[in-house]
């Protein structure tokens, strides 16, 4: 059974492990080995997530100890900053449960997120959940990869 609950500070160690595993699997085809090594260091990921967790207007949910999602309240809505799950949970409904609960908590306001342009699996997932590419692109700080912005204006 899938459960989604508010994350605690102590969950950031597990979230970092999930992020590293997810990152290494999902982004292997379009991130350089150097960037992969730099961005998938468990100690650095944990420190980053612990820092983000303590920021104002940041919200975290854990999904069945196999995934997490975090978002930030903005002046115009909410930015979903990260959604990661262990590869063995892909396609099980975990991502759907986490994103649905996050959107429920975000409420009646626009939400957006950034996805690697080459990450077709993630883009299909977001489209399935009511997000659409709004035409905005940017160069990511991750290896200069192109990112596209997805919006869900009818939360």
What does each model-identified segment do?
Residues 108-110:
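A general structural motif
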Residues 112-123, 128-129, 134-155:
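C-terminal "cap" of GNAT-fold acetyltransferases
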Residues 1-4:
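Extreme N-terminal starter segment of soluble prokaryotic enzymes
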Residues 6-12, 16-90, 96-105, 139, ...:
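Acetyl-CoA-dependent GNAT
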